[in-house]
Amino acid sequence: MAKNVVVIGAQWGDEGKGKIVDWLAEEAGGVVRFQGGHNAGHTLVVGGKKTILRLIPSGILHESLDCFIGSGVVVSPEALLGEIDELNAAGVKNVEGRLKIAPTCPLILPYHIALDQAREASRGKGKIGTTGRGIGPAYEDKVARRAIRAADLLHPEKLREKLDAVFAYYNVQLQHLHNAESVKAEDVMAVIEKVAPRITPMITDVSRVLNEKNKNGEKLLFEGAQGALLDIDYGTYPFVTSSNCLAGAASAGAGVGPQMLDYVLGIVKAYTTRVGSGPFPTELFDEVGAGLAERGHEFGSVTGRARRCGWFDAAALKRSIQINGISGMCITKLDVMDGVETINICVGYELPDGGKTDILPCGSDAVEACKPIYETMPGWSESTFGVKSYDALPANAKAYLKRIEEVCGAPVAIVSTGPDREETIVLHHPFA
């Protein structure tokens, strides 16, 4: 029987999922994106060469591997084709032949982007921190049952009628609520006519193919985007993304039964980061935080925005472990902690009423009111960069990892000590 693995970000995103998915893909028969859009990038380094993927699964660099975009993903056709062109230019073989898109994927079109950007501009100081790429409005259309989906590209004779109804809805909002320019039907149709000939050959019944692969004993790898603490239901709402980022979303977003999900690997940075607005209890505003940002190259791969940095938040991670059923953790960027003399781990929070909790509360207001409770540990001066053996790690680094396990209640399965595929320590292989 095949063993299937779900990879999710266990913090606020940017944990290093792309590298680990690329590494695990060596043993997979298919890699599947199941939620999100092109609002976050996954950075891969293979042989010193960097590749940034936004929509295409991180297994695409393995040139015999099939990759899938499930119905839980909102797809910008223009962004997708741009990404394919980048991979083709880099010499990656048969990208369009190996990439399959579910017919039920909602499409991101110019009016989604226009509304997303107009809304964010009108929020003033209350900005959520959206990337302005149309992700939220596309998910709104899905729920409101007015989405244009990938399958609609196969029926151009019916598509224009659907679009006319959508234009009326969007242009009222753009013009009258946000004082922005309307979107012209001919501009959107021009985009669709340009992308459809390349998109339609990739449209496939993804759910059926994945289930067939599973029956044939092939291992499947489900790749999440963003992070659990940005989940639309369980994140620090409203400072969240527009989709469910949890392991459970892999089932609905890919079209497989939950019994097919055997192992949940939570990707966890050795410190904590967050992009954009929203509460962040362990955020650092001193030279330690600046040092983490500099050594960790903490800038968004898609937006270029600087990431906020802070101490490891075990209480937040406990919430993520709980809501995802994490089987094992992969600790990334351990090498960024090299040289930090004294390390703090947040093990809980003081609450406004004088009480304490050892797990992240629900909602941004409750999290904003939390004051972190720290345990202090000695750091290490030795370099962990590129170390490939657990025994070769400094004693204090091993003690740090052990304490994370103890406080969070989940085992460390993998340790990443650098951006390259090979800079990885394996304690327990998720596919084993």
UniProtKB/Swiss-Prot annotation:
Pathway: Purine metabolism; AMP biosynthesis via de novo pathway; AMP from IMP: step 1/2. It comes from the Bacteria. One of its GO terms (cellular component) is cytoplasm. Substrate binds at S301, V302, T303, G304, R305, A306, R307. IMP binds at D14, E15, G16, K17, N39, A40, G41, H42, T131, R145, Q226, T241, R305. It is found in: Cytoplasm. It catalyses: IMP + L-aspartate + GTP = N(6)-(1,2-dicarboxyethyl)-AMP + GDP + phosphate + 2 H(+). One of its GO terms (biological process) is IMP metabolic process. PROSITE patterns: ADENYLOSUCCIN_SYN_1, ADENYLOSUCCIN_SYN_2. Binds 1 Mg(2+) ion per subunit. Keywords: Cytoplasm, GTP-binding, Ligase, Magnesium, Metal-binding, Nucleotide-binding, Purine biosynthesis. One of its GO terms (molecular function) is magnesium ion binding. Its EC number is 6.3.4.4. The keyword Nucleotide-binding applies. InterPro entries: Adenylosuccin_syn_GTP-bd (IPR018220), Adenylosuccin_syn_Lys_AS (IPR033128), Adenylosuccinate_synth_dom1 (IPR042109), Adenylosuccinate_synth_dom2 (IPR042110), Adenylosuccinate_synth_dom3 (IPR042111), Adenylosuccinate_synthetase (IPR001114), P-loop_NTPase (IPR027417). GTP binds at residues 13-19, 41-43, 307, 333-335, 416-418. The active site is at D14 (proton acceptor), H42 (proton donor). The keyword Nucleotide-binding applies. Its main location: cytoplasm. Plays an important role in the de novo pathway of purine nucleotide biosynthesis. Catalyzes the first committed step in the biosynthesis of AMP from IMP. Belongs to the adenylosuccinate synthetase family. Homodimer. This is Adenylosuccinate synthetase. It comes from Neisseria meningitidis serogroup A / serotype 4A (strain DSM 15465 / Z2491). The lineage of its organism: Bacteria, Pseudomonadati, Pseudomonadota, Betaproteobacteria, Neisseriales.
